[in-house]
């Protein structure tokens, strides 16, 4: 009976946590872009580099990403969008994952991991998942490693040392 109780509690917790993740709608994009800029500003300040592409992205560009892929949002219990991730599949069945963001006040609570799990689940026909992150973001590198991504190579992109990872 105790085992069933433990199983049931874990199962219910998993259902509850995933109700926070859903596909973004077009009217969410303004809030997601704002969250993106807030999240990447922390990185920009650490690097003293304020022209990072995620900080410069505009509404038209995020709308294009919305049209060509999937954008997920993580909604807190009080209805605020506090996390997001994007994915799109190319013609070679590679899923390109990008812009995993979590509001600074909500980091280190498992939200990034949940978003990664869910975006991968939504692309069952992909044989490879690919992403890149800045070398100066060790916490992000650690998260991606924990969820199964391996470093493929390093390259300079727009003056930033980037790490390409795949799963």
Regions found by a protein language model. Name each.
Residues 122-133:
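Conserved GNAT acetyl-CoA-binding A-motif
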Residues 61-73:
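A short helix-loop-beta-strand connector motif used in the catalytic cores of GNAT acetyltransferases and
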Residues 34-62:
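Conserved GNAT-fold acetyl-CoA-binding loop/helix
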Residues 106, 110-118:
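Conserved acetyl-CoA pyrophosphate-binding loop and the N-cap/start of the following alpha-helix
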Residues 19-34:
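A short beta-loop-alpha structural element at the N-terminal edge
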Residues 113-114, 121, 136-153:
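Conserved active-site alpha-helix within GNAT-family acetyltransferase domains
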Residues 73, 80-89, 96-101:
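Conserved beta-strand in the GNAT
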Residues 100-107, 133-135:
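A short, internal acetyl-CoA/4′-phosphopantetheine-binding micro-motif in the GNAT/acyltransferase core
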């Amino acid at each position: 009976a105790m085992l069933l109780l433990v199983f049931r509690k874990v199962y219910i917790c998993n259902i509850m946590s995933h109700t926070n993740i859903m596909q973004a709608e077009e009217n969410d994009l303004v809030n997601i872009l704002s969250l993106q800029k807030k999240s990447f500003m922390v990185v920009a300040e650490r690097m003293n580099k304020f022209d990072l592409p995620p900080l410069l992205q505009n509404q038209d560009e995020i709308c294009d990403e919305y049209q060509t892929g999937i954008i997920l949002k993580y909604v807190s219990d009080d209805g605020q969008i506090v996390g997001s991730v994007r994915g799109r599949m190319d013609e070679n069945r590679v899923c390109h994952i990008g812009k995993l963001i979590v509001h600074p006040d909500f980091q280190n609570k498992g939200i990034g991991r949940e978003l990664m799990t869910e975006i991968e689940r939504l692309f069952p026909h992909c044989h490879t998942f690919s992403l890149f992150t800045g070398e100066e973001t060790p916490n992000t590198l650690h998260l991606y490693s924990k969820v199964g991504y391996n470093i493929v190579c390093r390259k300079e992109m727009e003056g930033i040392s980037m790490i390409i990872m795949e799963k």
